UniProtKB/Swiss-Prot annotation:
Protein name: Probable 3-beta-hydroxysteroid-Delta(8),Delta(7)-isomerase
Positions of transmembrane segments: 28-48, 58-78, 115-135, 175-195
Membrane topology category: Multi-pass membrane protein
GO MF assignments: C-8 sterol isomerase activity; cholestenol delta-isomerase activity
Keyword Membrane: yes
Example of a GO biological process term: sterol biosynthetic process
Family indicated by similarity: Belongs to the EBP family.
Annotated localization: Endoplasmic reticulum membrane
Protein's UniProt keywords contain Hydrolase: no
Pathway terms, separated by semicolons: Steroid biosynthesis; sterol biosynthesis
Catalyzed reaction equations: lathosterol = 5alpha-cholest-8-en-3beta-ol
Signal peptide boundaries: none
InterPro entries: EBP (IPR007905), EXPERA (IPR033118)
Organism lineage: Eukaryota, Viridiplantae, Streptophyta, Embryophyta, Tracheophyta
Length: 223
C-alpha cells in the first residue's frame, strides 16, 4: 500500500502510517485560544477583588502555561505516533498542524522530546503550584516563580539552539516558521524573562531586609 505524502520538511522524512490532518488550521487555533481564554477568565473572576491586578495576571499566566505544559505537551511526549491518529482527536491534530512549523515534533527529535518531557512532567505541575503559592501568599512564591521561569528560558534556548545547529530548516514555509516556530514560542521567552526580573528584585529586597535585621540584632547584643 502506497504511503500518503506528508506536508513536512524534509520531504523524505519517514512517517509510516501517516494520516493527514482532518481539522482546519482556524478550527485548531480557535479551540486552543477559546479554551485558554475561558480558563484564564475563570481564574480572573474566581479571585475577583481578593488579589491585586498583577497577582491575578500572574495566576492567569501560570494557569495557561501550566495546563499547556501538562495537557498539550504531555500528550506529545507520551503519544509518539500521534501522526497515525485517524480519529480526529484534537490533541493529535494540534501536533500534526504545529509540526508544519517544526517537523522535529512529528519526527520525534530526541532534543525536542527531552525538553518537552521535562517541561510536561516537572515545569507544568510546578506552574500550577505557583498559582497556589500566589493565592496563599506562600514564602516560596517568588523563588518558585523564578525557578520555573529560568527552566522555561533554558528550555527555549535548547529548543532554538538545537534547531540552528541542525540547520534550522524544519518549517514547511515561511508562514509556519514565523507564526508557529517563532510566534507561538516567543511568549515563553518574553514573559518568563519579565517574571524572572521581577522575582529577582523581590528576592534581593527580602534578603537585604533580612540582612539589615540581623545586623541590627547583632549591634543590640554588642551594646
Amino acid at each position: 500500500m502506497e504511503e500518503l505524502a506528508h506536508p513536512y520538511v524534509p520531504r523524505d522524512l519517514n512517517l509510516p502510517g501517516y494520516v493527514p490532518i482532518s481539522m482546519s488550521m482556524s478550527s485548531i487555533v480557535s479551540i486552543y485560544l477559546g479554551s485558554s481564554l475561558l480558563v484564564v477568565s475563570l481564574v480572573w473572576l474566581l479571585f475577583g477583588r481578593k488579589k491585586a491586578k498583577l497577582d491575578k495576571l500572574l495566576m492567569c499566566w501560570w494557569t495557561f502555561t501550566g495546563l499547556t505544559h501538562v495537557i498539550l505537551e504531555g500528550y506529545f511526549v507520551f503519544s509518539p505516533e500521534f501522526f497515525k491518529d485517524n480519529t480526529s482527536a484534537y490533541l493529535a491534530e494540534v501536533w500534526k498542524e504545529y509540526s508544519k512549523g517544526d517537523s522535529r515534533y512529528v519526527g520525534r527529535d530526541s532534543a525536542v522530546v527531552s525538553v518537552e518531557g521535562i517541561t510536561a512532567v516537572i515545569v507544568g505541575p510546578a506552574s500550577l503550584l505557583a498559582i497556589y503559592a500566589i493565592a496563599k501568599e506562600k514564602s516560596y512564591s517568588y523563588v518558585l516563580q523564578l525557578a520555573i521561569s529560568v527552566c522555561q528560558l533554558y528550555g527555549c534556548l535548547v529548543y532554538f539552539i538545537t534547531a540552528i545547529l541542525e540547520g534550522d530548516n524544519f518549517a514547511t514555509n515561511s508562514f509556519y516558521y514565523y507564526s508557529y516556530y517563532i510566534g507561538a514560542n516567543c511568549w515563553w521567552v518574553l514573559i518568563p524573562s519579565l517574571i524572572s526580573f521581577r522575582c529577582w528584585k523581590k528576592i534581593c529586597a527580602a534578603a537585604a531586609i533580612a540582612n539589615n535585621n540581623v545586623e541590627t540584632k547583632t549591634k543590640k547584643k554588642t551594646r
